[in-house]
Design a protein with these regions (language model features):
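Positively charged n-region of N-terminal signal peptides that target proteins for export
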Residues: 1-8
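Acidic, low-complexity segments
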Residues: 8-10, 22-188
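Short, linear, compositionally biased motifs with a strong N-terminal bias
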Residues: 14-15
Length: 188
């Protein structure tokens, strides 16, 4: 009888411990919470919570209590259908509790923090190939829609470059022509 009671108590205590552990984990979103202590006596710390989508990619980053009025700063990362970074949003303020912020609230908060701009995000366009190389990157704000940074992937052509010291056969050298917002090209 004593052994049976001991086993029942053990099973009940394990059940209670598992329930306590489950109550500490968010049931709606996956996240990793990080604390960085800023003083040796652990009196001050910075806390950051990174929420992940269903595929394990970071979707929201919450810097807890980082604004002057002790509110959270939340950043959003959106992905396209192929898992590439599509839009990186400017941060928005939230209530200050480190919780996940709904997408619509975050988008309107980022827009209001950016002075009402309708494009408070950086947007990247990729080429339609399995290499997933970016071809254009539009800066934050409506003013930069017509002035993207563009990337052109080129191979060596005997007519396009003069090579003084190197003998490279045509088509063997891959380079990138980056055109900035003002239309100035730079070759890499």
């Amino acid at each position: 009888m004593y052994k049976l009671m001991k086993r029942i108590y053990l099973l009940l205590s394990l059940l209670l411990c598992s329930l306590l552990c489950m109550s500490q984990v968010s049931t709606s979103q996956n996240y990793i919470s990080t604390r960085t202590y800023t003083s040796p006596d652990q009196s001050g710390c910075r806390e950051q919570v990174v929420y992940f989508d269903g595929l394990g990619r970071p979707s929201q980053t919450v810097d807890c209590g980082i604004t002057p009025d002790r509110k959270d700063l939340v950043s959003l990362q959106e992905y396209d259908d192929q898992g590439r970074k599509l839009r990186t949003w400017l941060p928005a303020k939230s209530a200050g509790n480190g919780n996940y912020m709904p997408l619509s609230s975050l988008q309107s908060g980022a827009s209001s923090l950016a002075g009402g701009d309708v494009r408070p995000y950086l947007q990247t366009t990729y080429e339609a190939s399995p290499l997933n190389r970016p071809v254009a990157q539009h800066g934050v704000g409506e003013a930069w829609v017509e002035h993207p940074v563009s990337y052109q992937y080129i191979t060596r052509d005997p007519r396009s470059f003069s090579w003084l010291y190197y003998k490279i056969p045509s088509g063997n050298f891959l380079g990138v022509c980056t055109t900035d917002e003002d239309g100035n090209p730079a070759y890499e």
